Every structure is written in C-alpha cells, then in structure tokens.
C-alpha cells in the first residue's frame, strides 16, 4: 500500500490516538456505523488502531427502515467480510405508529426514528461512549463540537457545557449519568476522507459513484426512486439521469447530484472544483433555522 501523504498521516495518527484513548477511558464504547464513507474510514481506522486484535467494541446501526437498499446490502457484506459485531436498532414504537419520511415529514421522522432510536439503543445497552464520524467542516453546529463531546443523562448536547480542548489535551472524564460522543474525524475534510479512501483502498457504497438512476425532482433536489414506497405526484414520472450521492441517509431525504465521477479519483477531482457543502443534498438540514443544532441538543448523532 502506498505511503500516505504527510497531512493524511498526521490525521490518521490523531484519529487512532483518539480511538485508543476512548477504548482506555470508557467502560462500554460503541462505534456508530451509518454505512457512509465517513463510517467506512472510521471503521478502517479502528481496525488499524487495535490490529492485530479485533476491534474491541461493537458497531451500532440505527435503522430507520428507509435506507437505500444498496446501503443495507453493503452493511451486511462488510460485517460478514470483517467478522464484526453489529447491533441493529429500530424504534419499534415509531415503526408501529407508521412514522416515515414521506407522510410524517422529515423533522418528525428524524426525531423519532433517528434521535429517539439512538437514545433507546444507548440506554438499552449501557454504552457510555458513542464514536461517530462527524466532521467539523460539514456544518456550522458541528464546527463547535469537541472531540470528546459531553452529553447529559438524556443524551442532550449543550454547547455551553463543553470543556476546553487545547491541542491534543482531550478530557474524557464524565460525571455519573453523563456519556460522550467521540468524533475522531473532527479535523478531517470531505476531500481528506476521499483521499484517504483512495490511498487505503477502502470500499464504499456504490451510490457514491455516478450511474444511471431513476430520479424525481422534489424540494429542489433529485430524489432517487429506490423502491415502490415513494409515491409519485400527479403527472410525475421518474427520469433516468447520471447521478451520484455526496452524502447518504434515508433515501427520500437524500438528494443526488448530476455527475460523471465513476471512480474515487474522479470524485477527488470533482471535490477540488466544488464550492458547495456535501450536506446540500440532506433535506433534513432545511427543516427550520438552526435545525442541526436543535437536533443535536435533542440527542441527534
């Protein structure tokens, strides 16, 4: 495998140190696995951090029931290939109520099937540290997130109740009832992630690569018709377009972009010319002003 460029080598070393610090400091950590490119890089780093031993904590996937079919297939194949321990949790109460991203709306769907589901899973299994792949460059509320981000007993985030983190002086100590979200990729950018994927040959979901896919125009975004549950509006017909996804979530809430980038190298070239956020395709970010910060205060990823 080629030698990493110096900037990626430093980012890798920092992330591995954070993962080892987490394993040493907490009783029951868990790695949040959302199946996207950041989760893939995070999992690769975790395997490196503890090699030749297995990853010393399980993976947790909060399944809303509305992920792309290719994402679920990729998740299951990855777990089998690497021999990982995966916990899949769904908010059964929300499912019984029929909460979904179409009829219920993105805000309610996200709160019930993602935020409440995550809190349920953390409480049920007693996890005191949840390791996630969020990065500070993604969104302004994440820009002020600490590497070790304190959550109260209700898993809520208060930006005023966070500790200083000077240089690499992390503070993983918590009070009884508290937990933390740990973000080893805090200082990475989207371009860093893709360069690392290329350098380390990390597999990613094929949806990241351009291909002909059936899409409809919804809320200013190109929404892929992934299965028969997406109702078509009167006069609406899916069209085949060459698109890819910069970010992946529930398929009715994830907008595609027109693209010809069919390889990781193509994506890197595209990223170098891009002047827009990767989260432009996430419909949940536009629910209301400061919606991401409000979601995080409620316990979102």
Curated annotation (Swiss-Prot):
Keyword ATP-binding appears in the UniProt entry: yes
Enzyme class: transferase
GO annotation terms (biological process): hydrogen sulfide biosynthetic process; sulfate assimilation
SUPFAM superfamilies named among the record's database cross-references: Adenine nucleotide alpha hydrolases-like
Keyword list, A-Z: ATP-binding, Nodulation, Nucleotide-binding, Nucleotidyltransferase, Plasmid, Transferase
EC number annotated for this UniProt entry: 2.7.7.4
Catalytic activity: sulfate + ATP + H(+) = adenosine 5'-phosphosulfate + diphosphate
Superkingdom classification of source: Bacteria
GO molecular function: ATP binding; sulfate adenylyltransferase (ATP) activity
Gene3D superfamilies membership: HUPs
Region (Disordered): 278-301
Subunit structure as annotated in this protein's UniProt entry: Sulfate-activating enzymes, NodP and NodQ, may be physically associated.
Family: Belongs to the PAPS reductase family. CysD subfamily.
Function: Proposed to provide activated sulfate for transfer to nod factor.
Protein name (database record): Sulfate adenylyltransferase subunit 2
């Amino acid at each position: 495998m080629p030698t990493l460029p110096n900037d990626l080598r430093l980012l890798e070393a920092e992330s591995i140190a954070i993962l080892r610090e987490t394993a040493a400091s907490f009783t029951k950590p868990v790695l949040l696995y959302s199946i996207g490119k950041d989760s893939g890089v995070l999992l690769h780093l975790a395997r490196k951090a503890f090699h030749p031993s297995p990853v010393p904590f399980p993976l947790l996937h909060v399944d809303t029931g509305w992920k792309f079919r290719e994402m679920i297939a990729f998740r299951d194949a990855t777990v089998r290939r690497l021999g990982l321990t995966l916990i899949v949790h769904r908010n059964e109460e929300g499912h019984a109520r029929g909460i979904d991203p179409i009829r219920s709306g993105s805000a309610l769907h996200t709160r019930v099937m993602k935020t409440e589901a995550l809190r349920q899973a953390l409480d049920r299994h007693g996890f005191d540290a949840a390791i996630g792949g969020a990065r500070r460059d993604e969104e302004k509320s994440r820009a002020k997130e600490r590497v070790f981000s304190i959550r109260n007993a209700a898993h809520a985030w208060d930006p005023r109740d966070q500790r200083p983190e000077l240089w690499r002086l992390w503070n993983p100590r918590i009070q009884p009832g508290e937990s933390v979200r740990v973000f080893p990729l805090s200082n990475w950018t989207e371009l860093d992630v893709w360069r690392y994927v290329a350098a380390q040959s990390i597999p990613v979901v094929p949806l990241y690569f351009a291909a002909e896919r059936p899409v409809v125009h919804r809320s200013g975004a190109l929404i892929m018709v992934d299965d028969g549950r997406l109702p078509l509006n009167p006069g609406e017909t899916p069209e085949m377009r060459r698109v890819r996804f910069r970010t992946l979530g529930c398929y009715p809430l994830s907008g595609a972009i027109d693209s010809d980038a069919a390889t990781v190298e193509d994506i890197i070239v595209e990223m170098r010319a891009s002047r827009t956020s990767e989260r432009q395709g996430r419909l949940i970010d536009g629910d209301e002003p400061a919606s991401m910060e409000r979601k995080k205060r409620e316990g979102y990823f």
